[in-house]
Amino acid sequence: MKKIALLLYTVIVLVLAASCDRRAEYLTASGAMLGTTFQATGDITDCTAQELYRAIMQIDAEAKASMSIFDSTSLLSRINRGETDSLDEHIIYNLRLAERFSRLSEGHYDVTVKPLVDAWGFAGHEAERTPNLDSLLQFVGYRRVHIRDGRLVKDDPRVQLDFNSIAKGYTVDLVAALMERCGAK
């Protein structure tokens, strides 16, 4: 009986010791994304570094095609020009989140600021000498846009959206979810 107990004890100790000795093998994917650089590192078990990198680049491409104000062919650029009112899941999610932040901040956070961003020379536009803010503010206000049946309804067609303040964080969330699907711990 003592031999069985000793053998069982030895097996348990060896199993525990072997499991404690596991060394994490971290994978890293890095590159350029959304106008900046990224490095994603994790103890990933279900994807290779190359698969992780490709999937991150796909997320980047989808985010740019949807929400970029720097790409004239993006869905958001086409919406801002009044060429479409169709929305994709990225814009719907971010617009709903932005509306929530706008309500919580009593309108101090607002993604309809694109006319002001342009007038002040941000986002690659040349600044107006002295922007006429009163004329621009009539097109700014989070309550001026609504989602109805997957479409954007603007109170005025000159209202424009700019998700630059929220899109990078959203994209990082997508990458984090990807890493979890790849087995990141």
Model-derived segments and spans:
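A contiguous, well-ordered beta/alpha segment that forms the leading edge of an enzyme domain
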Residues: 4-9, 14-164, 177-180, 184-185
